[in-house]
Amino acid sequence: MPIHHSVFNHPFETKQQEIDWIDGLPFSPSYDDRFFQADAIKEIKDVFIVPNNLEDRFKKSQKISIGELGFGFGLNFFVTAMIWNQSKRHSSSAVLNYLSIEEALPSKEEISKVLENFPELQKIGEYFLSHYLPVHNDMQRIELPGLNIRLTLIQNNAELALQNLLGFSNNLIDAWYLDGFDPAKNLAMWSSSVTQLVALLSSNQATFGTFTSAGLVKRNFTKFGYAVSKVKGFGKKRHKLIGKILPRKHIQNPLSVECSKIAIIGSGIAGSCTAYAAANHGLQVDVYEYGQEAACGTSSNPVAAMYPRFSSNNSSYAHLIAQSYFFADRLYSNFQNEYKRTGLLFSHFNKYQEDWLQQMIGLDRKDIFQQFTEAEMKKEFNLESKGLKVLQGGYLFPQALCQALLRHEKIKVYIDHCFENTYKNNLKISLNFSNQLNSKQYDAVVIASGAGLLNVIPSLKISKGQLVGLKDSPDITCSIPINSEGYILPPIDGITWIGSTHQKDFQDLLPSSEATKDLILRTERNFKINLGSADGALTEARVRLGSKDRLPIAGKISNDQHIYAIGALGSRGFSLAPLMGELIASQ
């Protein structure tokens, strides 16, 4: 996994601006400067919109990417969104990609207070706030379908955030907003290294606008390949800088530029999330399923839950788990029949779990965690333990959710197709199936076939997991998923499902009566409850796939073709799949 650079000690560390309010406008005592003036909308148009020629580019382009250093209170974004939506010639399929970096994000209340000064931005601002949930730092992707905008908001310092974006040609920016405080007071953002990173992440058509006319900024951008001009500034400011990238050779990403139709092998949670993300990126998607209906394999369990076992360190893995969990929660919340946003409960802690509990409590994030005393747990959940509730997340109906994700106008599902391999067909990719003829050609193929990934990545680990469904369990009355050494899911149609086993050596996927008894006994011991007899218990057994380092697979697996894989999601499949699918769709 690539090294992840962050200014924060863990994903849940927060940082906000120090603000004084003067006449309803924010002032920074740290930089001894206003964030913006009362005529901010006019200044934004003059400093960023016009120099980047955005009104004309919006009308001519189906896809454009804007990069911003300094999100502030979102005013640049709101004005851009307003102009983007006033551009009547862009079609409903046109998408604005807006990437913004800010080390200290504002609260919802602060943004609302700022918007009171700009009634023309109120509607767009309120729509944004309905999607704005900065529960973790670093990167979050915010889909704003009502505006045809895809916002990537990164809470990090500028240099580290830009470093993390290197290596992906889909991250190239067409127009830059450079909006930090005065270079004399904010040297870190205007450093030579930041300027070089901006240049490296610039497309061949890139331009920039900024309020400053500092010689340092002009020299740095000139050094790294921009033609820079000093022109009249806004209002009382004498000058400002604008720039355009000079001609150069730049490797573009063929998939992101030319891809229009892809095939996905597998319709489980990995395949359906990837298909949904790709369709939302404007691609035509064909999904091939070996069974007689979508999501009839591992993702056909009757009920499942997300798994918020967060980490309080600064590792790449910790950031991945936090980002993927909350991204999944936002996505699933659009499917209220298939996803129940109840939160999740942890209880009955062993020594290892007690250490984890104290780490989470130490984060002091009451917007994410709620503590329960033993008395409160007894009263609320009838459990003999203290508890910790994760307020976001919940449980879901896997097959129904997958099928809902696949009900997209740009997605077609083909059942009863047993995939064998891919082969080159001129500049396209075609597919072989053992039981079907298929002459279609694709720009890219994504293999999301669960255990079928072993055919292309044989080093993956496979195990068997078993669930047990119990009828009439009076000791279990909880309407929220409960986690300890194992888990208990809310009753569905009078059946309470518990899980799960991890069997590395197995010969088939038939449920085991011995595993059923062991799972019931383990659950009774862990949760201090009586589940009764195993007679009449329902059982489900599925394959679980993981990697040796426990990291998911999501990316390109062929050097000369656009063939991708997603899988090995382990026990976190429903938490990881949406973000991993978005990652592949963005390439």
Question: What spans do the regions from the language model cover?
Answer:
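The AdoMet/dcAdoMet-binding core of the Class I SAM-like
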Residues: R57-N171
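A conserved short coil-to-beta-strand element within the FAD-binding core of flavoproteins
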Residues: Y414-S430
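C-terminal catalytic lobe of FAD-dependent flavoproteins
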Residues: A534-Q587
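Helix-loop-beta segment of a Rossmann-like dinucleotide-binding subdomain
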Residues: Q122-G125, S312-N313, N337-F346, Q371-L406, ...
